[in-house]
A protein has these predicted regions:
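Nucleotide phosphate-binding/pyrophosphate-handling subdomain across enzymes
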Residues: 1-78
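C-terminal helical cap/extension that packs against the catalytic core
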Residues: 65-124
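Short, solvent-exposed loop/turn segments at secondary-structure boundaries
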Residues: 137-141
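Short, flexible loop segments at boundaries between secondary-structure elements
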Residues: 149-159
Length: 159
């Protein structure tokens, strides 16, 4: 097979990632914002949390019974959870005495709780990885993902 490397690279660069699946919606020197609205379990989120950088984790919705939170303790200090939705108390019990937690009834109010990120000088990732089903407040994960993107622009001005 005879392939032109430039053509292959050009073709690969044309691919667009699927919406709301580990989608980086903002990246600057100190701040990265990821929309992973597709995530509906804790186990699908844990690999993202294994970082030495500060992570602001936004999650919530309908907890899937039997799901486990298996994150190594060494990452707890870098993690702060902002939990919304119907089963926020279920998540609170899972995380109690492990990570710092903030509770809110919905995504809009959750984003209002997050401190201003405009002047940060250390690396921070805002990770929207709900780790739960969306049906308590949204029709599906796509609607939830679109709502997150819209609310980020409104409540976390970053430019």
């Amino acid at each position: 097979m005879n392939l032109n490397l430039k053509t292959v690279i050009k073709t690969i660069n044309k691919f667009k990632p699927l919406k709301f699946r580990q989608e980086v919606i903002h990246q600057s020197k100190y701040l990265k914002i990821i929309n992973d609205s597709k995530s509906t379990t804790l186990s699908s989120t844990v690999p993202f949390l294994e970082s030495n950088e500060k992570i602001i984790w936004i999650l919530g919705g309908l907890f899937k019974k039997g799901d486990k939170f298996n994150l190594n303790k060494k990452y707890f200090k870098n993690l702060e959870a902002y939990i919304y939705g119907k089963d926020r108390q279920v998540f609170l019990k899972l995380f109690k005495n492990k990570i710092k937690v903030n509770l809110s009834k919905d995504l809009r109010n959750t984003l209002k709780l997050i401190p201003n990120l405009k002047d940060i000088r250390t690396k921070v990732t805002v990770l929207f990885s709900p780790s739960a089903a969306s049906f308590d407040q949204y029709k599906n994960f796509e609607e939830r993902g679109r709502q997150f993107n819209m609310l980020i622009k409104r409540y976390l001005p970053i430019e």
